[in-house]
Amino acid sequence: MRPRGLPPLLVVLLGCWASVSAQTDATPAVTTEGLNSTEAALATFGTFPSTRPPGTPRAPGPSSGPRPTPVTDVAVLCVCDLSPAQCDINCCCDPDCSSVDFSVFSACSVPVVTGDSQFCSQKAVIYSLNFTANPPQRVFELVDQINPSIFCIHITNYKPALSFINPEVPDENNFDTLMKTSDGFTLNAESYVSFTTKLDIPTAAKYEYGVPLQTSDSFLRFPSSLTSSLCTDNNPAAFLVNQAVKCTRKINLEQCEEIEALSMAFYSSPEILRVPDSRKKVPITVQSIVIQSLNKTLTRREDTDVLQPTLVNAGHFSLCVNVVLEVKYSLTYTDAGEVTKADLSFVLGTVSSVVVPLQQKFEIHFLQENTQPVPLSGNPGYVVGLPLAAGFQPHKGSGIIQTTNRYGQLTILHSTTEQDCLALEGVRTPVLFGYTMQSGCKLRLTGALPCQLVAQKVKSLLWGQGFPDYVAPFGNSQAQDMLDWVPIHFITQSFNRKDSCQLPGALVIEVKWTKYGSLLNPQAKIVNVTANLISSSFPEANSGNERTILISTAVTFVDVSAPAEAGFRAPPAINARLPFNFFFPFV
């Protein structure tokens, strides 16, 4: 009998809800297990006998078969592990993290990891950190979660349906294999799944920008600082990413022979793969070894044999010799993304207990094969502190001619302590972007020198040798793009006075620049350059009298960037006219 007024369908649903309630009354046991635990206890539903009256709840019966093993092992699942072979900050499930890394964690970014939430029973891993332990430890709990929904999935009969199948495209390399696997192109569900699950992941045939350089066993390690100044050896070297870092390493001087990061072999023994996942290897060749003594003197060794750190007892002190202080990689690559050559230079030194902890320096540079490297002053915008790129145009229609010395393309006078213009006549100071500079010197004159000869000499001192006519707008401007270069505007100011000699006294260079591009990453662009030569009148001196004149040069940088303004679209205008007799016959 069922209560009066309740429809049969509602009674059936109530019966199902009562069956589920009997399962959810029991609290799942919380256990702490290792990360390799994969067994899951799935809740099951009993069957409803046909003789049982509807609406009568009962406890779930025993399962008709063995419970399935979860497809996803949540104990090894880590969604925040984004860096291979490297610890991710605040990722408590990252297997690459150690107790040293846990000491800088603030909390677990992913505290709970679960599988498919549609199953009736599923495993869940709860991660936390125990900061009371020394060192801090990672704590995880493997628990069972019960899904109270009556429409949950009890068992999965077709496991391949839980993931997408990426079919393999036939080509000349795999056509014969597909023919044997497909059995004459008569595919069933089992055979289709069997060969698609064994597909090889396509690998890149070349290195791309930012891709870690692979070695025969792992990747090329480039130590750097992570969250502090301490060195981290698990940082991969990225393709075409030039780096220069300094980091500190805490060492025990008595164990210096056992620390790999202090040995040359740690950096020279790996072999770089020519392309990713290739069998061709490029050995690292040691090009030079420089020995640094305790008093900072440098001596280059004639041979390039690999040296090992050695602990030496010098009286009451202990010294460790042949310790790696600086490492410089120079990798040569082709335009096809292949590494063809790897050179390595070392600076070895002697470490005493006075210099512990030890500071190391690491550099890596990439050079394209069959090319001559050209240093830039920015890419694309100028970088503060780098020299301005300048040159001259020999004839109309040609490109810009630049000197090979990038620090000698646009220069001013060089100030010395003696303030003598003729002492260092050929020495000049480069104009650096963003640096407002002023320099000068003194020139002694006698009355026997004619005014025109003195004026010509002063001009040569101010302009220097080969003063340019054009300045590059960006730090990476090409010499052949002549129309993009900014011409230098020359201005001459003079103050005439009767019975006087006109001598140039100052050269003032004004560089106007603006911020170009996105507001998030603006680039410095030069828009105007003016060179103003200022002349003054000097009275004619009598023969035999000496006098001293002061000449100076100055460079100023002016930011002419306009403030950013928000852009608004004009409101839409309806260009429509009503018919002439629209209001007829009322008007």
From Swiss-Prot:
Name of a matching Pfam family: TCTN_DUF1619
InterPro entries assigned to the protein according to its UniProt record, in alphabetical order: Tectonic (IPR040354), Tectonic_dom (IPR011677)
Signal peptide range: 1-22
Cell location: Cytoplasm, Cytoskeleton, Cilium basal body; Secreted
Glycosylation: residue positions: N36, N295, N528
GO biological process: central nervous system interneuron axonogenesis; cilium assembly; dorsal/ventral neural tube patterning; in utero embryonic development; neural tube formation; protein localization to ciliary transition zone; regulation of smoothened signaling pathway; somatic motor neuron differentiation
Comp. bias regions, Pro residues: 51-68
Keywords: Cell projection, Ciliopathy, Cilium biogenesis/degradation, Cytoplasm, Cytoskeleton, Developmental protein, Glycoprotein, Joubert syndrome, Secreted, Signal
Biological role stated in the UniProt entry: Component of the tectonic-like complex, a complex localized at the transition zone of primary cilia and acting as a barrier that prevents diffusion of transmembrane proteins between the cilia and plasma membranes. Regulator of Hedgehog (Hh), required for both activation and inhibition of the Hh pathway in the patterning of the neural tube. During neural tube development, it is required for formation of the most ventral cell types and for full Hh pathway activation.
PANTHER family recorded: TECTONIC FAMILY MEMBER (PTHR14611), TECTONIC-1 (PTHR14611:SF1)
Pathological association: Joubert syndrome 13: A disorder presenting with cerebellar ataxia, oculomotor apraxia, hypotonia, neonatal breathing abnormalities and psychomotor delay. Neuroradiologically, it is characterized by cerebellar vermian hypoplasia/aplasia, thickened and reoriented superior cerebellar peduncles, and an abnormally large interpeduncular fossa, giving the appearance of a molar tooth on transaxial slices (molar tooth sign). Additional variable features include retinal dystrophy and renal disease.
Entry's family note: Belongs to the tectonic family.
Assembly notes: Part of the tectonic-like complex (also named B9 complex).
Name of the molecule in the record: Tectonic-1
Species per Swiss-Prot/TrEMBL record: Homo sapiens
Lineage: Eukaryota, Metazoa, Chordata, Craniata, Vertebrata
Gene that encodes the chain: TCTN1
